[in-house]
Design a protein with these regions (language model features):
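Conserved binding/recognition cores within well-folded domains
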Residues: 1-85, 89-91
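Eukaryotic intrinsically disordered, low-complexity regulatory linkers and tails enriched in Ser/Thr/Pro
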Residues: 1-14, 96-112
Length: 112
């Protein structure tokens, strides 16, 4: 993964630069998009669909309505839950299990 790939987020009056590889997951919270990273939370006024187009679909996959998970951080998957390496859990929609599993497997084969 290229560490130099960064995103610029506008959080009210502050501009934040975050590395894509440090994003654990992205979720919709109200009318904002929240980026969960190793360094903390960052918010953006742009919607999740806009960010989904900007993020690499081979790394970020929608695991549940309104949540994009970065597959590099997935530790394990169960029937309806994803466990991240940070020990956080995310919901996994039944209809998205196969897609998430396929993207995660592809990532493992390419980068692990």
């Amino acid at each position: 993964l290229d560490d130099r790939q960064t995103l610029m987020l506008m959080d009210r009056e502050t501009c934040h630069r975050i590395k894509r590889k440090d994003i654990l997951y992205v979720e919709t919270v109200g009318r904002c998009t929240c980026f969960h990273t190793a360094e903390g939370l960052f918010h953006s006024k742009e919607g999740l669909r806009i960010w989904q187009k900007k993020l690499d679909s081979s790394l970020f996959v929608e695991c549940h309505k309104g949540i994009l998970v970065h597959v590099r951080w997935i530790q394990s998957m169960e029937k309806d839950t994803i466990l991240l390496e940070t020990k956080e859990t995310l919901p996994l929609a039944r209809r998205r299990v196969e897609t998430v599993r396929a993207v995660w497997k592809s990532f493992q084969e390419k980068y692990a």
